[in-house]
Amino acid sequence: MEGDVGIGLVCQNTMDGKASNGNGLEKTVPSCCLKAMACVPEDDAKCHSTVVSGWFSEPHPRSGKKGGKAVYFNNPMWPGEAHSLKVEKVLFKDKSDFQEVLVFESATYGKVLVLDGIVQLTEKDECAYQEMIAHLPLCSISSPKNVLVVGGGDGGVLREISRHSSVEVIDICEIDKMVIDVSKKFFPELAVGFDDPRVQLHIGDAAEFLRKSPEGKYDAIIVDSSDPVGPALALVEKPFFETLARALKPGGVLCNMAESMWLHTHLIEDMISICRQTFKSVHYAWSSVPTYPSGVIGFVLCSTEGPAVDFKNPINPIEKLDGAMTHKRELKFYNSDMHRAAFALPTFLRREVASLLAS
């Protein structure tokens, strides 16, 4: 650990704010908990990796002290709460041009990847996210051939796509090479996805990459992006979804990470509403991931004009794909029953989004 302060307080250095691009707080904040970000300076609105007395927690230190004690602010994505993990050892900490990257060994969830103070994955429960975000769309269409991953620098989504033998090309556009390098070193079970010869890696901005892509190139696009804070807000706005739709074939599918139903109902509504203006059909599914805020994460699934897509009933079931169940490693979370169950929404969320999801 670094930087002992006072009574066993150990804090990592704060970021320099490069990822904000100077524009993060000037964008319109969606009508959800992100409003909390607007009341603190830009550098402080970013989350920083903090280890206090051997525990990692998502609140982060603001510069300076108050009354002799470090001042902590809630993460703007989920004000008023944070998940903590006991840290056995910090394995890596550095700043890329875009974000702070932290890897530590936890007491209960194995190794943990943290970006700008937000847990991205743990060895124990990554399967509940990686498997669902990949197979929900790919098992909903017949024989996908060209697939694009936006983000996904840890390689987990690539690992899951590689189970599908029909896929011929897997493009991945990741802006931060450090995430890829760190994953290859500390998370080889995920980064094995990069070893697939079908993978074509592109380092750069996804929006720019999509603008240069031929129209109708992809059967499926999977957006494994960071939370919509600062520059990433553009990834939940209409122009980006229009760019995604343009890159899909008729009947092509999109699966986009879509936050927590317990914390971001308004943001989910905003995303579904925007997608309804752009795509033929829109659905919402979810998965249980213990180390994500509130323990759940959602996905918006969309299809373009063309052959109808029945997302709720997999027509390309993973169980019938040759070797898919054990390719690279055995599936731990996803199966066809979990696929169908993922679209069952609790009553409170169904009330909120029913009119938006209606055909």
UniProtKB/Swiss-Prot annotation:
Induction: Up-regulated by abscisic acid and salt stress. This is Spermine synthase. HAMAP family: Spermidine_synth. GO terms for molecular function: spermine synthase activity. Putrescine binds at residue 292. The gene is SPMS. One of its GO terms (biological process) is spermine biosynthetic process. S-adenosyl 3-(methylsulfanyl)propylamine binds at residues 99, 130, 174, 205-206. InterPro entries: PABS, PABS_CS, SAM-dependent_MTases_sf, Spermi_synthase, Spermi_synthase_euk, Spermidine_synt_N, Spermidine_synt_N_sf. Belongs to the spermidine/spermine synthase family. Heterodimer. Component of a multiprotein complex. Interacts with SPDSYN1 and SPDSYN2. PROSITE patterns: PABS_1, PABS_2. Its EC number is 2.5.1.22. It catalyses: S-adenosyl 3-(methylsulfanyl)propylamine + spermidine = spermine + S-methyl-5'-thioadenosine + H(+). Residues 53-304 form the PABS domain. Gene3D superfamilies: Spermidine synthase, tetramerisation domain, Vaccinia Virus protein VP39. It comes from Arabidopsis thaliana. Expressed predominantly in stem internodes, flower buds and roots. Keywords: Polyamine biosynthesis, Transferase. The active site is at 224 (proton acceptor). PANTHER family: SPERMIDINE/SPERMINE SYNTHASE, SPERMINE SYNTHASE. It comes from the Eukaryota.
